[in-house]
């Protein structure tokens, strides 16, 4: 049947900021949905708060609202836009929760809920309704009890027993859940889970930890045609969230009858839910036909992004078309260009997904993996065998693996699921543990352990007898040339000459049964036939950014996609190399050719040798891609390839990173920089710090996201840093700068063609120097800087860009102290603020940069710096609610996972929007707790006065109450933590505090601060830790009480 003609306009809800449990997969699915709906003549209204996404580009939807994802705000958009339907399943858990809220408040009268019906949302997300539905259709679920209060826990424990699994209703990435082994743990987890749940409901169920975890991605249309897209198997057994597990496709350890038993159950469940579109169903499987249905995601999910990339089947595109009435057999599979979407995909290769965890950033975090997610991103690898896919995935992670050789230590690591366990499996086998021993400790299916044992045996074979046959077999297993050289004792070039280049095979949805129109490729040594074809068009390779991690997020995928789009519009053939299954850049039709490969020198150079490339672009893929620039140039020269690094030269990139060279450049341009130096040893560091004067900012060179960056105040702290935080070498010194206290920091993003410079935007940070720029809120245009200061910033930006020889993007960070503008650093590459600037001012910086890198001149383009009449604020999302044990104090090392944008016509309202979009809802009524250091009390006075004038009550400890009283402000007394209860922690737990403003000066106040922040995070109370943010919050609260928020589309602000 044709699409529903009554659906002319659809509201699509995005997923908001990148956070643990909800990453870039929803930008990929939402962007695909926008294109699919518009192909059918449907007008799309998009609402999403995340400026770093492709879907919030002004050209992606017909109307784009970059607004907080709050039901009351979306209700106003619905009233204004009058959509015929709402599509919630592309916005992850956020989209489903908001749709349910909107329906409950009556905002969806006359608006059709598309794809996932309201009944399916309730039955999929409400744990009690889901259990009842499964019982009705005869599908087994774990024994369980639903609780909505702590009084019910003893009864629940008596029914379920221990260990018990806790699953809150309507939460993201298992948030608020976990595994309890006794009543005290059960009480602690359930108390948090009830607070996280939208309906204050938690399921406590019997543990099936140790069973196999199997997932099916299924699709259904209005005609009741159902297909399975992909079956996936978790290497980790039940007890670890699927987002935290190593996952393999296709399912390899079930017999055919077992596979069809679960497949049939999955189809039965999607029919019972009446979902029209995609659905993810998770099973626990014990064997002997015994299984349990664990949960259903009646929407596009992280697993569906993986299934889509693993098979080539465009799940979000097909689900969007089904949502407006099309049948599966009426939708064309755009990968083959011939088959209908009703054909089930088949694959003739092995896909492995491995999560990327942030524990390299958070040393104190609890690394235990449970039913609540902690990873920030993931990589995907494809091979002809499990061993090859495993090793390519591990190579893609780009993490340092700590090896263990002590058996007692290994057994302890294996006994508890952590991020270290998968790597420890290899070490355990190297140390002689048997498969049975390891299987007994870990409950991992022996099949997977056998594959790892094959890899370990190959390591031994390479060492013992590295003949040609052994080396070739190692390549089939996925070993890199460098690894083979290390094990065999041979030179890398000798290995290269023996094994040659890999072949490249297609991912085409149909196991090569039909020719593919838009294929993507993976390398293998397990086949002889190469499926890459050649064209005569001018080809450019663009390196993507790999897995999402703190410091390198979706912003770089945005830049990659914009560069691809610009070059394809100009007629170039564009090839992308990336390994992240969540992203738009790895969508089947983003580039002319996609290589799903590790982002290493060897893997990239292999691709370059397979075709004639005009050039390679590294500056859009973040620090990892930029770090490849110099070695890749050397490799191109060594192999005598007819290609080049496009844009800014590797030497210019090195000049910006090399502190000594960069300082010489700034001196020659008469541009001020804080006193600084480089240290190649501990003694040099002491001497440099003494010359500069404490406090100093110390950091390693060539890193992203401020990794291992600290402010140190004396020799003792510096000694600790040099011995514990960094490894200094002759090629990687420690950089030491005078720390500019109370300075205002600025970021500038610009494009340079070697002759001219266009400034995209000047961003003023809300927080002062000392907080990493990636963790600071920032605003366009600057709010507190004089025209003279801004003129200096513009002048220095042009001089530095031209002095470095930038061709493409450049980001420069400044600090303003008094009337002096200091340059902190310059990064001649894409930055994490490029998407925010582009959305704020309407200039497509990444597209302009890509064209400049191909030789176009800025003078021939219709762009210039724009003065905007509105205000845009970028705020960050911090992961503390997902990572117990993490220090919540902000500093020079980046901790945020994502960002949001608030846009309005004054700073207060824009900041208010950004705050609530970042889940830090500023109160219009209630109690504010203020506890700041003595040096800030005079400055916090006006903040407190503004709060009281707006009807908020102030709570503080004795010293602050007295200080306020002497100055005419009434504050209520609350005990210090050390003075016992009732104190601020008790008030937070009781829900009596609406906002926390707290900083610290010494070890005791820092300890108190950490306790307050941890309870505030656990109970969802907004908190502020800097004076500047408190001032901004007061202005925001005052502004929204005086005037309503402006709800207008992005196109309205930027004149589209």
From Swiss-Prot:
SUPFAM superfamilies: Carbamoyl phosphate synthetase, large subunit connection domain (SSF48108), Glutathione synthetase ATP-binding domain-like (SSF56059), Methylglyoxal synthase-like (SSF52335), PreATP-grasp domain (SSF52440). Mg(2+) 3 binds at residues 813, 825. The gene is carB. Mg(2+) 2 binds at residues 295, 297. Residues 922-1056 are annotated as: Allosteric domain. The lineage of its organism: Archaea, Methanobacteriati, Methanobacteriota, Stenosarchaea group, Methanomicrobia. Mn(2+) 2 binds at residues 295, 297. InterPro entries: ATP-grasp, ATP_grasp_subdomain_1, CarbamoylP_synth_lsu, CarbamoylP_synth_lsu_oligo, CarbamoylP_synth_lsu_oligo_sf, CbamoylP_synth_lsu-like_ATP-bd, CbamoylP_synth_lsu_CPSase_dom, MGS-like_dom. The large subunit is composed of 2 ATP-grasp domains that are involved in binding the 2 ATP molecules needed for carbamoyl phosphate synthesis. The N-terminal ATP-grasp domain (referred to as the carboxyphosphate synthetic component) catalyzes the ATP-dependent phosphorylation of hydrogencarbonate to carboxyphosphate and the subsequent nucleophilic attack by ammonia to form a carbamate intermediate. Mg(2+) 1 binds at residues 282, 295. Residues 131-324, 663-854 form the ATP-grasp domain. Its cofactor is Mg(2+); Mn(2+). Pathway: Amino-acid biosynthesis; L-arginine biosynthesis; carbamoyl phosphate from bicarbonate: step 1/1; Pyrimidine metabolism; UMP biosynthesis via de novo pathway; (S)-dihydroorotate from bicarbonate: step 1/3. Coiled coil: none annotated. Belongs to the CarB family. Its EC number is 6.3.4.16, 6.3.5.5. Keywords: Amino-acid biosynthesis, Arginine biosynthesis, ATP-binding, Ligase, Magnesium, Manganese, Metal-binding, Nucleotide-binding, Pyrimidine biosynthesis, Repeat. It comes from Methanospirillum hungatei JF-1 (strain ATCC 27890 / DSM 864 / NBRC 100397 / JF-1). Mn(2+) 4 binds at residues 825, 827. This is Carbamoyl phosphate synthase large chain. Mg(2+) 4 binds at residues 825, 827. Composed of two chains; the small (or glutamine) chain promotes the hydrolysis of glutamine to ammonia, which is used by the large (or ammonia) chain to synthesize carbamoyl phosphate. Tetramer of heterodimers (alpha,beta)4. Mn(2+) 3 binds at residues 813, 825. GO terms for molecular function: ATP binding; carbamoyl-phosphate synthase (ammonia) activity; carbamoyl-phosphate synthase (glutamine-hydrolyzing) activity; metal ion binding. NCBIfam families: CPSaseII_lrg, PRK05294.1, PRK12815.1. Residues 533-921 are annotated as: Carbamoyl phosphate synthetic domain. Residues 399-532 are annotated as: Oligomerization domain.
């Amino acid at each position: 049947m044709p699409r529903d003609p009554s659906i002319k306009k659809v509201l699509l809800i995005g997923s908001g900021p990148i956070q643990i449990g909800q990453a870039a997969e929803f930008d990929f699915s939402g962007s695909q949905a926008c294109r699919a709906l518009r192909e059918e003549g449907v007008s799309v209204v998009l609402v999403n708060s995340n400026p770093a996404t492709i879907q919030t580009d002004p050209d992606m939807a017909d109307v784009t609202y970059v607004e907080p994802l709050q039901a009351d705000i979306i209700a106003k958009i619905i009233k204004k836009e009058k959509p015929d339907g709402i599509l919630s399943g592309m916005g992850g858990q956020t989209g489903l929760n908001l749709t349910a809220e909107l329906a409950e408040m009556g905002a969806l009268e006359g608006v059709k809920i598309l794809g996932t019906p309201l009944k399916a949302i309730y039955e999929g997300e409400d744990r009690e309704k889901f259990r009842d539905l499964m019982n009705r259709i005869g599908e087994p679920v774990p024994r369980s009890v639903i609780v909505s209060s702590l009084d019910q826990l003893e009864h629940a424990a008596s029914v379920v027993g221990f260990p018990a699994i806790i699953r809150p209703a309507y939460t993201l990435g298992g948030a608020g859940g976990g595994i309890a082994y006794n009543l005290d743990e059960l009480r602690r987890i359930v108390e948090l889970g009830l607070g996280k749940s939208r309906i204050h409901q938690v399921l406590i169920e019997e543990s099936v930890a140790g069973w196999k975890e199997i997932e099916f991605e299924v699709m259904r249309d209005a005609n009741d045609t159902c297909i399975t897209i992909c079956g996936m198997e978790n290497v980790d057994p039940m007890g670890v969230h699927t987002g935290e597990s190593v996952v393999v496709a296709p399912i390899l350890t079930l017999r055919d009858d077992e596979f069809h038993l679960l497949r049939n159950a999955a189809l039965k469940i999607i029919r019972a839910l009446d979902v029209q579109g995609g659905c993810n169903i998770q099973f626990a499987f014990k064997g002997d036909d015994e299984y349990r249905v664990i949960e259903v995601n009646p929407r596009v999910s992280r697993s569906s992004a993986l299934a889509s990339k693993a098979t080539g089947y465009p799940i979000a595109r097909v689900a969007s078309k089904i949502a407006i009435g099309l049948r599966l057999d009426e939708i064309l599979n755009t990968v083959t260009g011939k088959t209908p979407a009703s054909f089930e995909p088949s694959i003739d290769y092995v896909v492995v997904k491995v999560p990327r965890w942030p524990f390299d950033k958070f040393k104190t975090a609890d690394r235990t993996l449970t039913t609540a997610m902690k990873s920030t991103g993931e990589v995907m690898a494809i091979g002809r065998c499990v061993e090859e896919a495993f090793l390519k995935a591990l190579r893609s992670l780009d993490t340092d693996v700590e090896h263990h050789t002590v058996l007692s230590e290994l057994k302890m690591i294996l006994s508890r699921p952590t991020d270290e366990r998968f790597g420890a499996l290899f070490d355990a086998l190297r140390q002689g543990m048997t498969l049975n021993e390891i299987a007994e400790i870990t409950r991992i299916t022996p099949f997977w352990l056998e594959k790892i044992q094959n890899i370990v045996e190959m390591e031994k074979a390479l060492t013992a007898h590295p003949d040609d046959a052994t080396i070739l077999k190692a390549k089939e297993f996925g070993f890199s040339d460098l690894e083979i050289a290390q094990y065999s004792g041979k030179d890398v070039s000798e290995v290269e000459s023996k094994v040659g280049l890999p072949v490249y095979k297609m991912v085409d949805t149909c196991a090569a049964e039909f020719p593919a129109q838009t294929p993507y490729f993976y390398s293998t040594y397990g086949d002889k036939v190469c499926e890459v074809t050649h064209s005569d068009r001018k080809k450019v390779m663009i390196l993507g950014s790999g897995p999402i991690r703190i410091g390198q997020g979706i912003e770089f995928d945005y830049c990659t996609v914009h560069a691809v789009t610009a070059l394809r519009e100009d007629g170039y053939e564009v090839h992308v190399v990336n390994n992240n299954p969540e992203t738009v850049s790895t969508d089947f039709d983003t580039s002319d050719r996609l290589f799903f490969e590790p982002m290493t020198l060897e893997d990239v150079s292999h691709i370059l040798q397979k075709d004639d490339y005009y050039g390679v672009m590294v500056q859009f893929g973040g620090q990892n891609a930029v770090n490849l620039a110099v070695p890749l140039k050397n490799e191109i020269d060594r192999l005598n390839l007819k290609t080049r690094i496009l844009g800014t030269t590797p030497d210019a990139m090195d000049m910006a990173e090399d502190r000594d060279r960069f300082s010489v450049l700034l001196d020659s341009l008469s541009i001020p920089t804080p006193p600084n130096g480089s240290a190649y040893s501990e003694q040099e560091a002491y001497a440099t710090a003494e010359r500069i004067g404490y406090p100093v900012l110390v950091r390693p060179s060539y890193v992203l996201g401020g990794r291992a960056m600290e402010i140190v105040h004396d020799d003792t702290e510096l000694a600790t840093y040099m011995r514990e935080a960094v490894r200094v070498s002759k090629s990687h010194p420690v950089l030491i700068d005078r720390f500019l206290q109370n300075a205002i920091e600025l970021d500038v993003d610009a494009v340079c063609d070697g002759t001219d410079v266009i400034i995209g935007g000047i961003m003023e940070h809300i927080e002062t120097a000392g907080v990493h720029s990636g963790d600071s809120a920032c605003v366009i245009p600057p709010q507190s800087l004089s025209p003279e200061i801004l003129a200096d910033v513009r002048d220095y930006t042009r001089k530095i860009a031209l002095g470095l020889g930038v061709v493409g993007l450049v980001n420069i960070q400044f600090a303003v102290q008094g009337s002096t503008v200091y340059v902190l650093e310059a990064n001649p590459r894409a930055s994490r603020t490029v998407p925010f600037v582009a959305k704020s001012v309407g200039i497509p910086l990444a597209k302009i940069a890509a064209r400049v890198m191909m030789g176009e001149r800025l003078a021939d383009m219709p762009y210039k710096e724009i003065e905007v009449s509105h205000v845009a604020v970028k705020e960050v999302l911090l992961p503390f609610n997902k990572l117990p044990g993490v220090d919540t104090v902000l500093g020079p090392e980046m901790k945020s996972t994502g960002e949001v944008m608030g846009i309005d016509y004054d700073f207060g309202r824009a900041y208010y929007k950004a705050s609530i979009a970042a889940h830090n809802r500023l109160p219009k009524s209630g109690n504010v707790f203020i506890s700041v250091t003595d040096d800030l009390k005079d400055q916090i006075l006006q903040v407190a006065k503004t709060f009281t004038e707006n009807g908020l009550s102030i709570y503080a400890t004795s010293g602050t109450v007295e200080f306020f009283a002497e100055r005419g402000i009434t504050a209520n007394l609350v005990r210090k933590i050390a003075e016992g209860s009732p104190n601020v922690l008790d008030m937070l737990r009781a829900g009596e505090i609406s906002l926390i403003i707290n900083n610290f000066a010494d070890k005791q106040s820092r300890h108190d601060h950490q306790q307050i922040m941890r309870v505030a995070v656990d109970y969802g109370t907004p908190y502020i830790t800097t004076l500047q943010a408190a001032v901004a919050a007061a202005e925001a609260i005052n502004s929204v009480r005086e005037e309503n928020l402006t709800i207008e589309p992005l196109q309205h602000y930027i004149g589209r």
